[in-house]
């Protein structure tokens, strides 16, 4: 594989912040490689909402969940990121998702997430970044995806701009392959959190 072992290991970055009882929303999770690890961390009182646009990918992800854990995972096939009437989400996870979305779809995703989060929600983000010595590989990937899956982009998104515009502050970051892909932990910036007004009279 061109991307190697580090690519697969990167998907485990920051999963340790998931606590027993958490509700975790995985968006664009593909075949579910990280599902067993998330299940272990959120425990029997936790819940996973696993959203994927491809039915084929979703079926493969279901195969990674044992019978005794199936009640703890809700699988949703969706392209518009819409959730049913769930409670607040504790952890949002997007891994190698935003790079395949248009700017409009990215903003739609942030809008959907905003409706389901609280001040304590964490967002675990992982995606490719434009680095000089990997431009050929980025071009190859985007061109290949464009031909095979109608990839809408010609270049990688400005992820940092979107997180900043939607009031998410970066708390931690880990780079892989000299910055070719990065894992980041985000939380809502203080200005985005509605604080209660206390009147002292």
Predicted regions and their residues:
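A conserved beta-strand element that flanks and buttresses the S-adenosyl-L-methionine
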Residues: 93
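Conserved alpha-helix/loop element of class I SAM-dependent methyltransferases that forms part
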Residues: 4-21
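Helix-to-beta-strand junctions that scaffold the AdoMet/dcAdoMet cofactor pocket
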Residues: 43, 101-102, 117-119
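A short glycine-rich, Lys/Arg-flanked "PGG" loop and its adjoining helix->strand segment in the class I
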Residues: 107-119
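Core SAM-dependent methyltransferase catalytic element
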Residues: 167, 171-201
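C-terminal alpha-helical "lid/dimerization" subdomain adjacent to the S-adenosyl-L-methionine
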Residues: 126-177
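Class I SAM-dependent methyltransferase SAM/SAH-binding core
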Residues: 25-82
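Class I S-adenosylmethionine-dependent transferase superfamily signal
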Residues: 14, 38, 112-113
